[in-house]
Swiss-Prot record:
It holds the Pfam family LpxD. This is UDP-3-O-acylglucosamine N-acyltransferase 2. Pathway: Bacterial outer membrane biogenesis; LPS lipid A biosynthesis. Its EC number is 2.3.1.191. Coiled coil: none annotated. PANTHER family: UDP-3-O-ACYLGLUCOSAMINE N-ACYLTRANSFERASE, UDP-3-O-ACYLGLUCOSAMINE N-ACYLTRANSFERASE 1, MITOCHONDRIAL-RELATED.
Length: 343
């Protein structure tokens, strides 16, 4: 069962309510009024917990779980015990996410401004905002309604933040325009100068940065992620993007709508990502490239050339998945035969 030490769930909910929330179908209409009190892993569930099955490798656990209710894909219904109530959805992980949001809704703290917060007189703060201790709000800043600004967070001059945003503790934001429903986790740094300089034999010469950072609506930015401001243009993160912890976004980078960047991704300056691009953990991308719509780059790959829309690439340097697999098979064969690859 869930650990309620830190977050107590809402509910309980009846199955017909969860079906409506998630868009799932109650299998054979059974169990409409059965009550679910929490969410749990298959191996830890009690009879009133809800579990999920979305991968075949967990079928054995499903057969032995104590849970009476499971969110499940259509292809896995045949593996469920006869006594189990099923919420069937073509994307059970999405259905689980929607139900989890119902059990654990986002907290909306009441309006509050700490006496230790420093807010410049020209700043405009919306209604029902929560400004925590030690926060600094600069000149001509505009913060929308129902926002939360965490402890010791710095919001620099002329920054604009939309409605319903959560800016956690120890964040710094400069030279940025941020949309609605944005979450920025602790330690993130947004809007500092990028890594730009000219060099000769006598040293390095800084290129001043005059651009900003534009972040769309419904974006999440992970802890200790850094997003540099543009040099002459802006750095842009479009709507619905998800950036994990410890991601580095260089100056002038453009990230298309709905893209997902996993932990420790690094993107050098002026590279552009299309919509719904996925960069897995530790992917590195050099500057001035274009990665097309819907492309996927597998973990730890290093990208040195453009990637076409819809392509899936991996390796170092990144190539198509089929070519990467051929390279790996060739290396294994060469090692086993103790022969060096031909030049």
């Amino acid at each position: 069962m869930s650990n309620y030490q830190f977050t107590k769930p809402a509910g309980p909910f009846r199955l017909f309510e969860l079906a409506k929330i998630s868009g799932a179908t109650l299998y054979e209409g059974k169990g409409e009024t059965f009550t679910v009190s929490g969410l749990a892993k298959l191996s830890e569930a009690t009879s009133n917990d809800l579990v999920m099955l979305h991968q075949k490798k967990y079928v054995k656990e499903l057969k032995h779980t104590a849970a009476r209710v499971c969110i499940i894909g259509p292809d896995y219904v045949k593996y469920a015990p006869d006594s189990m109530y099923l919420l069937v959805h073509p994307n059970p992980y999405k259905a689980f996410a929607l139900i989890a949001q119902a059990f654990y809704p986002s907290e909306k703290p009441p309006g509050f401004i700490a006496t230790s917060a420093m807010i410049e007189s020209s700043a405009i703060i919306g209604v029902d905002c929560f400004i925590a201790h030690g926060a600094y709000i600069g000149n001509q800043v505009k913060i929308g309604n129902r926002c939360k600004i965490g402890v010791n967070t710095y919001i620099g001059d002329t920054v604009t933040i939309g409605d319903d945003c959560l800016i956690e503790d120890n964040v710094s934001i400069r030279h940025a325009v941020i949309g609605n429903n944005v979450v920025i986790y602790s330690g993130a740094r947004i809007g500092q100068d990028g890594f730009g300089f000219a060099s000769d034999a006598n040293g390095h010469y800084k290129i001043p940065h005059a651009g900003g950072v534009i972040i769309g609506n419904d974006v999440e930015i992970g802890a200790n992620t850094c997003i540099d401001r543009g040099s002459l243009d802006n750095t842009v993160i479009e709507d619905w993007c998800r950036l994990d912890n410890l991601v580095q976004i260089g100056h002038n980078v453009k990230i298309g709508k709905g893209s997902v960047l996993v932990a420790q991704v690094g993107i050098a300056g002026s590279t552009e990502l299309g919509e719904h691009v996925t960069l897995a953990g530790q992917v590195g991308v050099i500057g001035h490239l274009k990665i097309g719509k819907g492309a996927t780059v597998l973990a730890s790959a290093k990208v040195y050339k453009n990637v076409k829309s819809g392509d899936r690439v991996g390796g170092h340097p990144a190539v198509s998945i089929s070519d990467w697999q051929k390279q790996i098979r060739f290396l294994k064969t060469a090692i086993k035969s103790k022969k060096s690859p031909k030049s």
